[in-house]
């Protein structure tokens, strides 16, 4: 096993268009106004993404990211629970533009590795198509 595989990972994964079909804040507002606590029923899961998330090892950390307003926290958490989505944290109120992940390269010998380890990766997926990746 290479050193990178032995390290616990942190996954930053967007919600809308990646885990569930794309919705906008105004759509969620309307659902909350008309359906109250059942507003999450307007959401459509992308099954292969839910499956992917639930295959991530429990030792890894899953941070969901979203441009959803923080006022939609309860709605979003109910929806994720209803669909059985595994996560550790959610970051709300992010900008809808590009997201950058910047991290250092672990030098040889710092994690039992003989070579440097890259510690930042990114993957773009087609909107509403889900995550097609093996864990």
Q: Residue locations for each model-derived region?
A:
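HAD-like aspartate-dependent phosphatase fold
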Residues: 1-135
């Amino acid at each position: 096993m290479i050193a990178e595989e032995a390290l616990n990972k942190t996954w930053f994964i967007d919600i809308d268009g990646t885990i569930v079909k794309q919705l906008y804040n105004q759509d969620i507002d309307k659902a909350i106004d008309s359906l109250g606590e059942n507003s999450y029923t307007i959401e459509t899961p992308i099954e292969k993404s839910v499956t992917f998330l639930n295959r991530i090892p429990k030792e890894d950390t899953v941070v969901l990211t979203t441009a959803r307003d923080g006022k939609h926290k309860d709605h979003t958490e109910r929806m994720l629970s209803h669909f059985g989505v595994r996560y550790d944290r959610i970051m709300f109120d992010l900008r809808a533009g590009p997201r950058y992940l910047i991290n250092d390269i672990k030098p040889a010998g710092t994690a039992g590795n003989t070579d440097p380890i890259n510690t930042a990766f990114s993957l773009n997926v087609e909107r509403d198509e889900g995550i097609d990746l093996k864990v």
